[in-house]
């Protein structure tokens, strides 16, 4: 009598990779497809392959830049690996845990360790809450500190992000764009995370304010031993802040390497074309554009 053996899918990540404590994030063959329409003739559904088989690893305490043109799947990658939306397939390990295999309760327990800073600081902040409540809401919900230490803790976090204690009672509309982004960073930092996805955190800001926010992120990384996935279309910013860089095109990771190596010697034709569009601050120098 033939017995049917239950098929057990082998993990995509090796045991050695999982046991390496330096690997805070491991992404293997991540896919995220969005259904768009169903054919009347065949009855089959078509899909947009926003993320199509992306793999990379981020070392603890480092910053990985993720670049590419609009619509290439950068932000979808960041949101999916945090499980803000469900995957189509693939595996994502954060601190050795496969995040898509966790139950809702297990996921809730690790949420404080994985945070995100969104692109638009105004739309990502509740207009109905004062800044102190915005930053402290998650702290109170997850019991990060005892109740008697709550106020002092929020004050310390705000000051670390360049905000003042008297800002607690103000509302988001009373702040500039740069200050609002500091509030978003403070909200993420207050939960004592290990890993933060920075989803184009400076693209909506003036150049001078961009530099301040980038320097703030770097200082916080050193002080709190943070790891970043820095998503941006601004290549000069990515070159400044990142240790490694991944280049995405049409949902695929076409190139991934150390920052210095990829900027000095890009290999993929799309990477070369992308870098050829970086403006040179000297008007006497002409660069060959690759279209």
Which stretches of residues belong to each language-model region?
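Short catalytic/signature loops enriched in Gly
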Residues: 1-23, 35-42, 47, 258-291
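Conserved ABC transporter NBD signature motif
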Residues: 90-98, 110
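Conserved ABC ATPase "signature" region
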Residues: 98, 148-166, 275-276
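Conserved ABC ATPase signature
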Residues: 171-175, 179
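A short, proline-enriched helix->beta-strand linker immediately N-terminal to the Walker B motif
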Residues: 190-194
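P-loop NTP-binding/switch modules centered on Walker-like glycine-rich loops
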Residues: 201, 205, 209-284
């Amino acid at each position: 009598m033939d017995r049917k053996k239950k098929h057990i899918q082998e993990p995509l990540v090796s045991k050695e990779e999982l046991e390496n404590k330096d690997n805070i994030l491991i992404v293997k063959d991540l896919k995220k497809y969005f259904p768009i329409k169903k054919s009347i003739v065949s009855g089959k559904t078509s899909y947009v392959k926003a993320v199509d088989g992306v793999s990379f690893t981020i070392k603890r305490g480092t910053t990985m830049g993720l670049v590419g043109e609009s619509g290439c799947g950068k932000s979808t990658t960041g949101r999916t690996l945090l499980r803000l939306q469900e995957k189509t397939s693939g595996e994502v390990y954060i601190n050795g845990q496969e995040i898509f295999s966790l139950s809702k309760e297990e996921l809730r327990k690790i949420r404080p360790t994985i945070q995100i800073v969104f692109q638009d600081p105004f739309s990502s902040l509740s207009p109905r809450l004062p800044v102190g409540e915005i930053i402290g809401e998650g702290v109170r919900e997850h019991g990060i500190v005892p109740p008697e230490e709550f106020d002092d803790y929020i004050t310390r976090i705000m000051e670390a992000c360049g905000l003042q204690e008297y800002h607690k009672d103000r509302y988001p509309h009373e702040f500039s764009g740069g200050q609002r982004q500091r509030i978003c960073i403070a909200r993420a930092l207050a939960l004592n995370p290990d890993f933060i996805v920075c989803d184009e955190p400076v693209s909506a800001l003036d150049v001078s304010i961009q530099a301040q926010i980038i320097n703030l992120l770097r200082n916080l990384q050193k002080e709190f031993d943070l790891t970043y996935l820095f998503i941006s279309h601004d290549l000069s910013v990515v070159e400044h802040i990142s240790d490694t860089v991944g280049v995405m095109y049409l949902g695929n990771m076409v190139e991934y390497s150390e920052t210095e190596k990829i900027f000095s010697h890009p290999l993929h034709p799309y990477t070369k074309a992308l870098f050829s569009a970086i403006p040179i601050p000297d008007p006497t120098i002409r660069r060959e554009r690759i279209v």
